[in-house]
Amino acid sequence: MLQPLSHLPAFSLVEPLLQAIVNQNMIIGAPPGAGKSTVLPLSLLNTHIKGKILLMQPRRVVVRNLAQYMAGVLGEQVGDTVGYRIRGENKVSASTRLEIITEGILSRMIQSDPELAGVAVIIFDEFHERSIHSDFGLALALEVQAGLRDDLRLMIMSATLDTAPIASLLAQHSPVPTAQLASEGRSFPVTVNYTKEVLAHEVIPHCVEVIMNAVTNHQGDILVFLSGAGAIHAVASRLSAHQQQNDYIIHTLYGAMGKQAQQAAIAPDPQGQRKVILATNIAETSLTIEGVKVVIDSLWENSAEFHPSSGLTQLTQTRISKASAIQRTGRAGRVSEGVCYRLSAKESFERFAEHSAPQILREDVAPLLLETLNWGTHFSNLAMLTQPSKAQSAIAIKALEEIGAVNKKGDFTAYGRSLAQIPCHPQLAHLLLFAKQNVSAVAQFSDAQKCAIKTAAPFIVALAQAQLQSEHVLISDALLHFTPAQRNDITKQAKRYAQFVGLSEQALDLSALDDEALGLCIAIAFPRQLAFKTSASYKLAGGKGADISLANPPQWIAVLQGQHIGNSVKIRLAQPIAEAHLKALYPNQFTSSPKVQFNKESQVMEARKVTSFYAIELASSPLSKSERADDPQFYLQETASAWLRYLDALPLKQWPLSQANWRWWYRVKLAAQLNLPQPQAYDTPDPWPTSLSELLTQARDQLAQSLGTCKNLQSLHGLGWQKILTSALSWPQQDALSQSLPDSVVIPTGRKVSLDFRENGDVVLSVKMQELYGLSSPYVVADGKVKITYELLSPAGRPLQTTKDIVGFWQGSYKEVQKEMKGRYPKHFWPDDPANATPTTKTKKAMDRQAAK
C-alpha cells in the first residue's frame, strides 16, 4: 500500500512508529517534504489498530488536498477508507477509517462524545503553528485519555517543533509514556537571496519587480508568499498589466477561495504552462505543490489580533518568524535545486523572532472559555501548553456575563450551555438564539421587524466570520456590490445557521434583507461596537474613538468590522441604527447620573449630570452647589476617582512629581536593587517596590484621600507628593532607607549636603572641591555596598572632576587640576596635600584673616 511513498524520508519511521504506538504516545519531528502527513497516517491503517484515526490539520484546503492524495494512493475515492470533515462539509462513510479534520472539529467531537468511541489514534499535525484549536484539542484529548480512554493514542507531528515543552506536558498529564522519532526532510539545496529593505506599503511593487526578474532568470513554477487576499489581488493585477505574452499563468491561493480554484492552483497545469502562484501562508506546510523551483517570500502574513479596548478582532499584517521563513524556503527545493528571494535586507531578517507567538495569546478567548466551561472546568485546570493571561480571561468572562452565558459569580448557565451548541463565536450564537427566542419579547418592535431580524441574523453571522473586504462601508451597499461568487458564499454560510433561528434554508434570501434589521443584528451581538457621532468622529460604546469614510455619517452606527490605526478605529463595515431601537434593546444602558470630570480647557474638575450609553457620553450639564451639597462625601470620592483616571492616562514621567520626588524614588529603587535589609522588621520584611508604578499602586489609598479636595491642576501639583509616596513604604523600610541610604552627608566643613540619587543607580555628592580638603577616606552608603560619586566643583560652581575614588584623586590627577586652577582662581586655596589640608569655603585672604584672629 505504501510502496509509492517509500522514497519519502518519513518512510524510515514507519516500522519504529508501528512498534512504539502500541503502548506509547508519539512525538514526530520532520521538516517539510519528509512526507510525515501522508506516510505515517496511512501506515497506521495496516496494523493491529482497529479504530478510527483522526488527523487534525489547521487549514481546510490542506484537509481536502490530503484526503484526495491519500485516497489516490489507496486507489479509492475520498469518503471510502480516507475521508474528511470540515465545518459545513464532510465526505465520510461507514467504511472510513482515516478521517482528516480541521482543528475545531475535534473539540466538538469530544464535547458530544467524551469517550470518543471508536477512535484509536488522534494525530495533531503541524502542531508547531500553535493554533488555539490545536492547543485546546490536545488538552481535551489528554483529559479523555487520562480519565476514560487509556487505550487512546496521541501523536503530535511538526516540522519545526521544539519537542521539550510538549514532551514535558505529555509526561505530566498523560497516563501513557511518550516516545519521540525524527526524520530528515526531502529537500534539495535552495539558494537564499535577500533583496532590499522595503516598508509594508512598498511590498507590492517590489514583489512584482522580483517576480518579473524571476520569470526571466529562472526555470520552473514560482510560488509567491503574500500577507493576504488583498495583497494577492493587487500583485495579480499588476502582473497581468505587465505580462507581455502568455508565457505563464497566474493562480491565487488563499483560504476563502472556492475548492475548484484552490485545486487549480495546486495541481500541475493541464497544458503544461508555467505557473506563478500567489499564496498566503496556507501554502507553507502540508500542501504539496509540484513543480515549484522558485519561492518569493514577502516575509509578511495576516494574523488575527483581538483588541480588548474595542472588542474588535482584525487581521493585522505582521512579520513572520524565522521558522516560518525556513518553511517557505523549503518549498523551492522539493523537486530540484531551487532559489528563494526574501524581500528584506539580511540584517533586518536576522532580527526576526525565532518562532511566532502562540495564537492563544493574540486572540479573543471568549469562545475557548465557553467551550471550557461547557466541558465542566476552567482554563487553569486544563493541560494547556500556554495559558491565556489573567487579563484575557477576565475580558472573556465579562463578555460571557453580558450575554448571559455565565452569571455574576462566573458560574456557567443553562443559556451558556445552549450557546455552546452553536458552532460560532458566543456573541454571534447569542444573536441567533435572541432572534429565535427573545426578540418576540421586545414590545417596541413590530412583527415585521422581528421577522426581519430573524432572517438577517444568519447573514450577519456569515459576514462576521467571512471577514470579506469591501470598498463600501455600509453593509447594505456592500451586499449589493459583492460578486456573484461572494454572494453565493455568504448565502451558503448563512444557510448553515438557518436552523438556529427556526427557519428553513429556503427562507433565506440575500436580496430580500432589511437594512434596518442588519444594524439591529449587529447591535444584539456586539453592543460595545455601537458608535455615536460626537463631532467629526465617533465614540464606540467600549470607549474607543473611531472614524468613518462616509459622506453623510449617521448619528448611530453598528460596527461589524474595524481597523485599529494608532489610538483610533477606522470603521470598515457597519450599518446605521436608530437610537429608539437601541433604547428598546438596551433600556438599562441609557443612564443619567452625577459624575465628576476633568475639563481639559479650564483645567478644573467639574461636577456634571451625565447621560450615557455604556462609555459614550451623550449629554451633560453642570451641577449646582446645592445639588453637590446633598452628598458631599460622594463628590469627594468621585473627584478622587476622576483624578486617578486622569493620572492613570498619563505616562509616569508626566506625573506632577518634583525633582526631589524623583530623587527619592531613585533612592527607593536602589534599595530594591540591593534588597536593602530592614533590621526593624518584626517578621518577614515587606518586599521593596521594584517600579514606580508598583510604588504608586501601594500608595493609592493615601493618594485617593488627598485627591478628593483637589479642584484644579494647580492644586494637584501642590499636593504633598512626598508624604503620599512615603506612605507606600512600611515603617521598617522607611527606617532602613534613613539609616542605610541617607539623603545627605556632613562634609568636612561641617555643612550638610544633599546626595543626588540618580536613575542609573549612582549616588552623587556635588560640592566645591575646597570643602572636601582633609577627606582621607571615602563616603559609602548601604553598609559599604555603594560608593558615592564625587562631582567636584570649581569656586564658580562648575564641574572640574568626577570620581568615585577621592583618595586616589588626591594622590593622582589632582596635581593637574591644581596647576590649572591656580592660574584661573589664584585667590583660592590649592594645597599640595589636599588629603591633609583644612577644608574651607573662603578665599586665601579670608583664611589668613581668620587665622590672624
Named regions from a protein language model:
Residues 550-569, 757-788, 792:
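Short, surface-exposed, low-complexity cationic segments
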Residues 32, 57, 86, 226, ...:
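Active-site proximal loops enriched in glycine and acidic residues that flank catalytic Cys/His/Asp
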Residues 1-431, 440, 445, 505-507, ...:
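P-loop NTPase motor module signature
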Residues 111-112, 202-203, 307, 352-355, ...:
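Short conserved micro-motifs at the rims of enzyme active sites and ligand-binding pockets
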